Amino acid sequence: MNDNRHRSKPPASLAPRDLAALIDISAVQAFHTEADVRELAEIAVAEGFIAAHALPNFVPLLRSLVPPGGPTLVGGPVGFPSGGHTTRMKIAEASELAEGGAQELDMMINVGRLKSGDIGYVRSEIRAVVEAIAPVPLKVILELAHLTDEEIRTASAIVAESGAAFVKTGTGWTPSATTLERLKLIAVTVEGAVEIKAAGGIRSLDAIAEMLRLGVTRFGINTQVAVDLVRQCAALPGSRLDIAGKAD
């Protein structure tokens, strides 16, 4: 049920540390190495990014490198990147990651089942994983590049009622950038019942400000781009990013 718990307005402006506290960085491409994960942890902690994510086999290492009790959470992906794993596989993977120290998980939705109209399967799978890892929060990835507008609405509604913490736009494994138009579809559908994480092609402070005004509360951004954006924020007048801007 929609309880509007996430509908608070965004702040009027953000300082660099506030911005970093909205950004996840990651090393989840197939070619990322142990050295990349170590660098990821170092950057995440130094910059105060809210989360760092690594591929499942590197999550224990990442957990050991990020100080407990600090501002940076450790996360990992589930059913990544295709979403085509069975529900039992996703539960097992998510449970192992949670037991290994992951503090939040991003799970790929089963796109094939969604596009086949098997809504019951998609809904029950998300709920099963949410229950298996509770209280670890789950973000559900839609991969918008593969979906029609109607499928985005359907998937967003499923996530909103599933007990997941976030609906997320994409994995970062497709070339398509997240657009404002498709974010609006998600925001209008979920009506604040679940938080929104935008990921994919976010490369400017203006885009972040616009997305925050739409209701986005978390961003997945390329590590170097994220560092650059925090630096750009620090260079703005008063070292603050204006969010209030023109309302849509």
Curated annotation (Swiss-Prot):
Pathway: Carbohydrate degradation; 2-deoxy-D-ribose 1-phosphate degradation; D-glyceraldehyde 3-phosphate and acetaldehyde from 2-deoxy-alpha-D-ribose 1-phosphate: step 2/2. Transmembrane segments: none annotated. Pfam families: DeoC. Its EC number is 4.1.2.4. The active site is at 106 (proton donor/acceptor), 168 (schiff-base intermediate with acetaldehyde), 197 (proton donor/acceptor). GO terms for molecular function: deoxyribose-phosphate aldolase activity. InterPro entries: Aldolase_TIM, DeoC, DeoC/FbaB/LacD_aldolase, DeoC_typeI. It catalyses: 2-deoxy-D-ribose 5-phosphate = D-glyceraldehyde 3-phosphate + acetaldehyde. GO terms for cellular component: cytoplasm. One of its GO terms (biological process) is carbohydrate catabolic process. It is found in: Cytoplasm. Belongs to the DeoC/FbaB aldolase family. DeoC type 1 subfamily. Catalyzes a reversible aldol reaction between acetaldehyde and D-glyceraldehyde 3-phosphate to generate 2-deoxy-D-ribose 5-phosphate. This is Deoxyribose-phosphate aldolase.
